[in-house]
Amino acid sequence: MKWIKKGTFSGKQYRDDVSRKISWGHWFAFFNIIVAIFIGARYAFIIDWPDTLAGKLYFFVSLLGHFSFNVFALYLLVVFPLSFIVKNHRTFRGLTVIFSTICTTLLLFDTAVFNRFNLHLSSVVWNLLVNPENGEMSRDWQIFFAPMPIILLAQMLFSRWSWEKLRSLERQKWLKGTGIFLTTTFIATHLIYAWADAYLYRPITMQRSNFPLSYPMTARSFLEKHGFLDGEEYTQKLAQEGRLDALKIDYPKKELTYAPITHKPNILLVTVSGLRHDAISNEKMPKLAKFATSSTEFTNHYSTGNSNNAGLIGLFYGLNANYTDSILSNHTQSVLIEKLRAENYQLGLFSATNFKDSIFRQALFREIKLSSNKTNKPNNESAVKNLNDFIKAQKTDSPWFAYLDLALEAKNPSDYDRTLQDIDSLLAKALESTPLENTLVIITSEHGLTFNEMNQKERENYFGRDEIQVPLLVYWKDLPVGKQNGLSNHADIFSALMQTVFRVENPLMDYSQGRNLFDLKGDDWVLASNFRWNVVIQPDGTQYHIDRKGNYKKFDKDYIEQSSDRPPLGIFLEAFQLQNFFFEK
């Protein structure tokens, strides 16, 4: 190539040229640091802005430290080597300008992507947005490349001006002090975050993903090793209060209004943690199978996640499970429970596990005094007995809401089948004491149960049908008896109760991500989630997984991973909007 001249890379002239290019590169990098900080300031208007002064100050410190480090790192990785390789200074500056223009444009594009999807740019997100199959969407995003000529012009002008004024610029002494200051902000960013992570200071830890290529330092293992941190207590506190990077939640979006309720049915909601989608049959649960013949059975129903908390978020909040940590950390109340109390429903809450799942005491029933069961060890039998006593004590003219939380634990299929028989008998007793003529009965599961051998991390991210497809029986006089094969999930149950029973007048988007289950139309797709993955499930069981970093996988109905470069554009655009809609901005 002409711009890489042959000959030896030695001699005084060569060293002087390289020295001048390196000196110019420092000033050009400084210029781009300012540009990056200016563009990066836009994230302040996108993120969940912290409430505390320390949180606000950390944003500005991290803004300066993060972008100054990343720009200078790119200079060292790309521009600095070019100083030695490319001998022609015009070609060298031209390549540097082009590279800087591309990076600056991508940063500007990332702010737009983050604003819409709360995701930073990745190969999967890029393929979704710059998609020739959707010309209109492509045109929308191409608008963000319109400033590229302006950015290129600014880079060219500064490149030429700084090269011509280099001798004058080299006499400036303040650049060294500025460099030390920016280096200090970078170090402070990581040290402050490590402190906040260790002491659970959420106004700072919630800013973990503010910027692209952001990987703040943590020091839990170091502090635990040297006795400054109790690892077990720390993990338990996280489980109770939600992950540290959880955002604030805006739920419901608007104040809910209701039409007058002419008839208040009793409501019995039963969840059996670990009940698989194929459990209700004459062979495994004959009594419940008999009850199913007089109920509406939803055969293609999914939980909103793969844990108890995740399923309960869908049932009681109508949201997908990626809001779990936000609900825990903000102690967000369920509008369903609030409405039940406002309508003077008698509440009966019974748990075989003493409400051990954090969502119960941290948020869902936080305003309700729950029994501790200190004298007798709670189990399925005692929970059902307490439920039956509660139902018998109710007056016929006073509506009640009863929630029965049962647990199904088994290590292998044979243990599972034996436990099913016990659960079947207990549910039969509960239904016998229930006045069905005036009661809406819902029986489902927070999530299923898998017998596959997996470690903890694999189990947390497992979304096979045995784990997230669950049975659903609804006994309700206004529903047709029989099997419904349409796709549904737990958020649809919540929406049905709010719309059909309590006659909320707001549109669903104000308070729920589900559809009305009782419309019986079925969903085009449903969403299951955990703190990392969002899983789109289609009626045929096909799953599309995308995580918070833009990684993507596709699975068939048997949970066998398929080769796929890109998920369906329309579905994922809707899914992205759903996963961020109720986060406060």
UniProtKB/Swiss-Prot annotation:
Q: Which domain of life is it from?
A: Bacteria
Coiled-coil region list: none
Which GO cellular component terms, listed alphabetically, does the Swiss-Prot or TrEMBL entry include? plasma membrane
Gene3D superfamilies with a match to the protein in the record: Alkaline Phosphatase, subunit A
- Which cysteines are cross-linked by disulfides? none
Q: Which Pfam families match?
A: DUF3413, Sulfatase
Its family remark reads: To E.coli YejM.
**What protein is this chain from?**
Uncharacterized protein HI_0841
Q: What is the lineage of its organism?
A: Bacteria, Pseudomonadati, Pseudomonadota, Gammaproteobacteria, Pasteurellales
